[in-house]
Amino acid sequence: SSGEELKCDTICVAIGLVPSIELVDAMGGKRSLDSERGGYVPSTDDTISMVGDCAGLIASGFDHIAYRMDWMRALAKVSEPGTIVCQCEEVTRADLIGVQPPNYLERPSPMKARSLETLLADGPPNQDQIKRLTRAGMGVCQGRRCRDQIAMLLAIEAGTAFGSVPHASHRAPVRPLPLKILADWEESGAMRDGWVVWFGIPTQWVPYRDIGTPREAEHQ
């Protein structure tokens, strides 16, 4: 606020806290949006007790959602379109707004014709739809690191309130899956080969068998 300028080459930003309601949510517990308690919080009856981050932050009269939305608008103005918004799947802000798959996947022509603007013409933004089209929130963190910021970006682009963007569904192992789904799964050879890297994303891990070989450069 003083106008002082500091020379630096890297800025690390961690803004606010978000209640960890995933397990309560996956068990079918009700939730409500409470900006003074950090965002979505459980709203179950007295027969269920919750302690810690899953119960929400202590209400202090501070509007956490408005604060984070202001930060997101400011960051969007000063950051490059190539800024990563989903670290696990390497989805950039441009990919999200353009509704494009991450760079490690092919981008067919029909996908290039779509964008968030065209989707908004069909209806309000939906995180689960965006997940399927861009893989934002589909990584091993199950959207824990990016779910709220993706919802904020969608709300800003749509010109709507944060709470109007549906809360994204959870992924396994938070979401229970019947064993028969895993037992009957038919994996291709290419899929089996991909399990030794970070969910098959070449730029994030180098398979042990490729270290010290010409194929190692393919993962850089």
Where are these regions (language model features)?
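Short flanking/linker segments adjacent to small metal-binding domains or redox-active Cys/His motifs
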Residues: 149-150, 182-220
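Residues forming the flavin
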Residues: 1-134, 138-140, 144-186, 190, ...
